[in-house]
Curated annotation (Swiss-Prot):
InterPro entries: P-loop_NTPase (IPR027417), Sulfotransferase_dom (IPR000863). It is found in: Cytoplasm. Its EC number is 2.8.2.-. Keywords: Catecholamine metabolism, Cytoplasm, Lipid metabolism, Transferase. Sulfotransferase with broad substrate specificity that utilizes 3'-phospho-5'-adenylyl sulfate (PAPS) as sulfonate donor to catalyze the sulfate conjugation of catecholamines, such as dopamine, prostaglandins, leukotriene E4, drugs and xenobiotic compounds. Has sulfotransferase activity towards p-nitrophenol, 2-naphthylamine and minoxidil (in vitro). Sulfonation increases the water solubility of most compounds, and therefore their renal excretion, but it can also result in bioactivation to form active metabolites. Coiled coil: none annotated. This is Sulfotransferase 1 family member D1. The keyword Transferase applies. It comes from Rattus norvegicus (Rat). The keyword Lipid metabolism applies. PANTHER family: SULFOTRANSFERASE SULT. 3'-phosphoadenylyl sulfate binds at residues 48-53, 130, 138, 193, 227, 257-259. The active site is at residue 108. One of its GO terms (molecular function) is aryl sulfotransferase activity.
Length: 295
């Protein structure tokens, strides 16, 4: 495609019942046949749930807390977004195929769309879930600056789409529940964004235990410092400022916007909150999953 701008702001395309970027849908066979390796670590989240944060933590762990090594490249190349394929711009599958093991692999796919090779290889997976209201707000601002998404419309219009699952990667509700159930069968560490905000050191220790890595206290403290929001926000290899403006326009909204829990209270009207909560209870009542909307 000659004009790179042709790839942006296009409508989503349905893949097995899930709306995805048109370019992922076009190249779906390439994603579906992705070959996982047994020592891959998969990072899975619904969008705007702390993906970049946990990715940076894992890269710091794999580099023994050496922040300079983690500045070797942008986070989206150190931890490739497996299914993201944009003609002439990026191809997550190809990037990963060219990487040496052990690889850190990022995905936003719901559990039913994950390439089967991850299950066959019994890969370790880390899932991070964040409360729905904060995700909806963050996703709205992300749509404004990340041009692979369709135009979000007004906040009210976007919230309706979010509740209906008519956003990229489908319904938040099914996504978090699907991965929650799957953890009973496979090696999945299920973390909560709110716990990571409240006690990041404790959550990093959980990750280390899951990965069977024993590292000294001073290295853990380094990881804690270099993965903090303020340090990452100022770090060009973590904050996506190296991405071209046509793809992500940070003058519209920064990629790392606030990084807090409870910001939804600044966005939702009382009527929106009541409608959202009523709908939420119906969709989540049969699940054992419990979220905190603030800390």
């Amino acid at each position: 495609m000659d004009n790179k701008l042709d790839v942006f702001r296009r409508e989503l395309v349905d893949v097995q019942g899930i709306p995805l970027f048109w370019s992922i849908a076009e190249q779906w066979s390439q994603v579906e046949s992705f070959e996982a390796r047994p020592d891959d670590i998969l990072i899975s989240t619904y969008p705007k749930s702390g993906t970049t944060w946990i990715s940076e933590i894992l890269d710091l762990i794999y580099n023994n807390g050496d922040a300079e090594k983690c500045k070797r490249d942008a986070i989206y190349r150190r931890v490739p977004f497996m299914e993201l394929i944009i003609p002439g711009i990026t191809n997550g599958v190809e990037m990963l195929n060219n990487m040496q093991s052990p690889r850190l692999v990022k995905t936003h796919l719901p559990v039913q769309l994950l390439p089967s090779s991850f299950w066959k290889n019994d890969c370790k997976m880390i899932y991070v879930a964040r409360n729905a209201k904060d995700v909806a707000v963050s996703y709205y601002y992300f749509h404004q600056m990340a041009k692979m998404h369709p135009e979000p419309g007004t906040w009210e219009e976007f919230l309706e789409k979010f509740m209906a699952g008519q956003v990229s990667f489908g319904p938040w509700y099914d996504h978090v529940k699907g991965w929650w159930e799957k953890r009973k069968e496979y090696r999945i560490l299920y973390l909560f964004y709110e716990d990571m905000k409240e006690d990041p050191k404790c959550e990093i220790q959980k990750v280390l235990k899951f990965l069977e890595k024993d590292i000294p206290e001073e290295v853990v403290n380094k990881i804690l410092y270099h993965s903090s929001f303020s340090v990452m926000k100022a770090n060009p290899s973590a904050n996506y400022t190296t991405m071209m403006k046509e793809e992500m326009d940070q003058s519209v909204s920064p990629f790392m916007r606030k990084g807090i829990s409870g910001d939804w209270k600044n966005q939702f009207t009382v009527a929106q909150y009541e409608k959202f909560e009523e709908d939420y209870v119906k969709k989540m009542e049969e699940s054992t999953l419990k979220f905190r909307s603030e800390i």
